[in-house]
Amino acid sequence: MKHLFLVALSIITIASYSQKPKIFELKSPDNKTTLIISAGEQIRWAAEQDGQPVISPSAISITLENEILGRNVKITSSGEEKIARSFKAINYIKETVKDECNQLTLEFTGEWGLIFRVYDNAVAYRFFTKRKDSLIIQKEESNFNFPADEKLFAPIQWDYRDGKNFNSSFEALYHEIRCSQFPKDSLAFLPLLADAGGDRKVLITEADLEDYPGMYLNLNSTGQGLQGVWAPYPLKSRIFHINYVPYERANYIARVSGTRVFPWRVAVISRSDKELLNCDIVQVLASDQRIGDDYSWVKPGQAAWDWWNNWNISGVDFKAGINTKTYQYYIDFAAENKIPYIVMDEGWSDDLDLTKRIPDSVLNLQAVLDYAKQKNVGVFLWATWYAVSRQMDEVFPLYAKMGVKGFKIDFFDRDDQVVVASTYAIAKKAAENKLMVDYHGIYKPTGLQRTWPNVVSYEGVKGLENFKWANEDQPRYTASIPFIRMLAGPMDYTPGAMRNATAQDYRPVNGNPMSKGTRCEQLAEYVIFFTPFQMLSDNPTTYRREKESLDFITRIPTTFDETVPLESKVGEWAALARRKGGSWWVGALGDLQPKDIVIDLSFLPAGEYNGEFFYDGVNADRKGTDYRRETVTVRSGEKLKVHLAPGGGFAGRISPTAASMLQNRIDDFVIIAVSDLEPITVNR
């Protein structure tokens, strides 16, 4: 098969161009994934795994004002390198990340080149230039051709606020369509997943996106392939409600430095769906951290959030709303339950001017911050991107001095070069003031959270807020995003609904919203949906009535030392286990079809463990809040039989028993024995 694939690539290239191309073949460390590059009058790349084509020959190039990088190329040098390294991850799903691949660097006349990498589970390439003067990037060509008309999970957007479909909140259900059925008038944002047949999947995304527009995809001329599309550079913009929307764009996509690297174009190739739940490729390809040696002030954790529950607390002697007493109530709730943060969402200030706060007689922000400090609770403030991008030099020092710990910055709603560059500038300025940031209304993560670890989360997901106004198949979506969107990085889905309804009973309600699905599905989201900054979205009054669920939620960490994917299927159910210290957390959630799954505890080291498990109740198909809590003793290798109700879930905590912990200590104990006159160290 491989021989035929190489021949096909050569035939396509030679038939199209008179110049005989140079063919390069680069293999993964395990020799099972191959990247094939053809460089001549055009540059094409293709990929295969286990001898099966996964990406057919696909052309790539960058068009400048007077030349095309990728046409009629002349190679000046080529070199291969084996990369085998690891790094300590900051606030991630595991403690250490491995970067193991083979790399090919090609340099061409004209002071530019390409870097290709092959991992066991991914292929990637990026352009680079070494020129003195700045460059105008008129367009880029990036194709992903498939060997067949494959089924896609495509997050397609239709948003014409700017007249050109380049404004987006980056929230969309997945259109499960064949590639040839891709709507011609639309774009898909990343990540996008293709089913390559059997159990194999191909996920397309990008990494290390800096000072350059983000990539969208649409159908290319082959009819069974996708091509990159980029937002043109914005020249003029205007306020549209609280967005800043371009109304005039240039005929180019970016103006960049002449010496730079461009974003990685990435295709993740998995042999099973569960592999997608534990893929580090975006983290690996991102630029290393720039925050400095001391980032101890970047402290992940959970937050009590106001906006989703509409400030609807009850049983108090004051009027609930955006006022001092309400936020002191949220702070009390957070302190009682060891929740480290609260988020003060929209309403504390003018949306477009963060120096204009509502009167102290209504909301005394300094009093709230002082009260929070006394209770050892941090405060995040909501703000629009428009306001922050214009006022950060003034307001970041101001609010940091008052005691604010971070900002939730919303309504970017674009990923053109201007906005992408601003995400780095905001993160840097925030770090200078020891502020964390949570980006909302924004494109997918591409590694900025590694470069600037004070970026503690991203939205870029159709989260729980949609239950306030939409009746959609959210459970199938939540059973899909762990494999697709979450592969890109942290995901601020904002779980935690305590009003849980079946599909038959569900209805959108703004003031007292509910989730479609079961209580256990909400609990499972805290284990499965990774974000260092995790919301508790329902209101404190409701949580206090649901103390058993609350106590479980607030014990779940937001960063982990190890992640183990369990048997899963995209769009049907997702299951995984995560370890923090000596304790394991396990979760599973499903679509609207009831199903029986098995949770294999073979990931546990040998020993005896205490298990606390939450199962869908026997009547969860009739009443979404029905659940069963069970405490049992389990051992490694046991298999838990789990029934998922429609929109159901399962969640649990597994920790070593006292006897097991004692045995581990004995096993690790070092005995000093004496033999004649020489000490002997015996490890047991």
Model-derived features with residue positions:
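Bacterial Sec-dependent N-terminal signal peptides
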Residues: 1-22
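N-terminal accessory beta-strand-rich subdomains and adjacent acidic, glycine-rich linkers
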Residues: 21-284, 290
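An acidic-aromatic substrate-binding cleft motif
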Residues: 253, 257-333, 337
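Conserved, mostly hydrophobic/aromatic
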Residues: 334, 410, 437, 528, ...
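Aromatic- and carboxylate-enriched substrate-binding clefts and catalytic-loop regions
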Residues: 345-518
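Glycan-recognition and catalytic regions of carbohydrate-active enzymes
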Residues: 538-585, 621-625, 667-669, 673-677
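Carbohydrate-binding surface patches
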Residues: 570-606, 610, 650-651
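C-terminal beta-strand-rich structural cap/linker in extracellular carbohydrate-active enzymes
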Residues: 633-680
